[in-house]
From Swiss-Prot:
Family: Belongs to the G-protein coupled receptor 1 family.
Organism from which the protein derives: Pan troglodytes (Chimpanzee)
Glycan-carrying positions: N5
Segments on the Extracellular side according to the record's topology features: 1-25, 80-100, 159-196, 261-271
Entry's localization field: Cell membrane
Cited function: Odorant receptor.
Residues on Cytoplasmic side: 50-57, 121-140, 221-237, 292-312
Pfam families: 7tm_4
Annotated CDD domains: 7tmA_OR1_7-like (cd15918)
Protein name: Olfactory receptor 1D5
Entry keyword Protein transport: no
Length: 312
């Protein structure tokens, strides 16, 4: 009980990835620029989809929710990082750290599950086009998204509650960008074997199951596309999946760089990979999804024209 009280009343120091004032200034402007680009890109995606009735389809419904998740994700971490880079007070309360961790886990999980649902949408559209309207009905889309949210909220709550049973002692200095589960476990002075086992087991289920589902879906999609006789139709089918594959590759690639390693080897060198998945991935997603998408180009153009159109 004393350990719990000690943890509840303590603070952590988010020291970031550099203590050099010159480097901190560079990092501040870099992260601020990336944050603004991320917010602008994802807000434009949401506005374009919501304002264009031609984009009111399951694929764009899930894309808008993915953009919302990415927007929430960077807002959970980057503003605090920017404050720490400009301030001498780098403290974050125990409750604040747990709150940041909860949203971090929940939103990464939600991103992962939405990507899996988007793969299912592409599978039905290409492999079972005659059943697409019934298989991806509005009611089912809302149900799938609700399940994604429910599971993400539960998983974030589970890991956060488990961490409340951990006792922290000694210097509570986090040489990292934000409160991360692996980093916090390294600061613990109580036995973390059970929570580490739960973390690995649930993490494998939550992330590898959707990855396996997406891999299976795309194997079947590729087989179906290769059977299409028309070269132009093949290209169109591949192009509808290319952006999703790009986002999935970036998402899982950066997560693997950070988390597919033993806890005791987790060190400062992983900060670059963390920046990739925590900042770069949400920033790049809008560009990847709209790069070769003519429908998105048109919708974004109409949104921008309305925003900058002078009132008569």
């Amino acid at each position: 009980m004393d350990g719990d009280n000690q943890s509840e009343n303590s603070q952590f120091l988010l020291l970031g990835i550099s203590e050099s004032p010159e480097q901190q200034q560079i990092l501040f402007w870099m992260f601020l620029s990336m944050y603004l680009v991320t917010v602008l890109g994802n807000v434009l995606i949401i506005l374009a989809i919501s304002s264009d009735s031609r984009l009111h389809t399951p694929m764009y419904f899930f894309l808008a929710n993915l953009s919302f998740t990415d927007l929430f994700f960077v807002t959970n971490t980057i503003p605090k990082m920017l404050v720490n880079l400009q301030s001498q007070n780098k403290a974050i309360s125990y409750a604040g750290c747990l709150t940041q961790l909860y949203f971090l886990v929940s939103l990464v999980t939600l991103d992962n599950l939405i990507l899996a649902v988007m793969a299912y949408d592409r599978y039905v559209a290409i492999c079972c086009p005659l059943h697409y309207v019934t298989a991806m009905s509005p009611g089912l889309c809302v149900l799938l998204l609700s399940l994604c949210w429910g599971l993400s909220v539960f998983y974030g709550l589970l890991l956060t509650l488990l961490l409340t049973r951990v006792t922290f002692c000694g210097p509570r200095e986090i040489h990292y960008l934000f409160c991360d589960m692996y980093i916090l476990l390294r600061l613990a002075c109580s036995n973390t074997h059970i929570i580490h086992t739960v973390l690995v087991a649930t993490g494998c289920f939550i992330f590898l199951t959707p990855l396996g589902f997406m891999t299976t879906s795309y194997v079947r999609i590729v087989r179906t596309i290769l059977q299409i006789p028309s070269a132009s139709k093949k290209y169109k089918a591949f192009s509808t999946c290319a952006s999703h594959l790009g986002v999935v590759s970036l998402f899982y690639g950066t997560l693997a760089m950070v988390y597919l390693q033993p806890l005791h080897t987790y060190s400062m060198k992983d900060s670059v990979a963390t920046v990739m998945y925590a900042v770069v991935t949400p920033m790049m997603n809008p560009f990847i999804h709209s790069l070769r998408n003519k429908d998105m180009h048109g919708a974004l153009g109409r949104v921008l024209r309305r925003l900058f159109q002078r009132p008569k």
